[in-house]
Amino acid sequence: MTSNTVYASPYANNIKNMENSEITGLAKNRYTDSETQLAIAKCHYRLGKEYLAANPNVTKEAADELWDSRGYVFKSMLLSRGRIKLKKKEYAEIYRKYFKNNSRSHWRMMQAFLGGSYWQNTSSSNNRTPAALLEEIYADLGEDETQRSYTLERFIDHPNCSLNLALRISTMPDPPQQSYYHRSFADLRQKALMKVAEITKREELASR
């Protein structure tokens, strides 16, 4: 439903009168004012709201409005970019409510909890998924996913990857059948071992 709120911004006040392409342009623009962002977050045009969720300068107020929308699409986009900060237990609650055992949302789940991909111009560096939940997600992966080195590499690249998870990936056997999608597992294991060394060194320094 379109909001009846009166804004100071002429753009915000006229969102309801704009063409979809005009809303999209404002949603993508990093310098769109906060009132216009909020008006877009409250408008009916879903694609415009998706572009807003992907905007690196989305405001907290607009992000909160998108977060409160039904479903998991906006939630996954905001989580992947670190736009929403949750308590540790809330990450697990969101995962179990919207993504666990839901094959339709697998790609969105990976985006939400492991961060965006290189082709999305995002990374896992802003992603705050707790280590315990990363281990739960790893345990929930289907057999096909555990045979894709790219999927496993996203766990290693996550800033909260645990020592236990890195060790498990470092001992992964080669998949029974290599395919176009399977990168070298030897390289993957080596990267996981480097992560083990990194975590071990960090923990040793922290304990001094």
Give the positions of each predicted feature.
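Alpha-helical scaffold segments
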Residues: 2-208
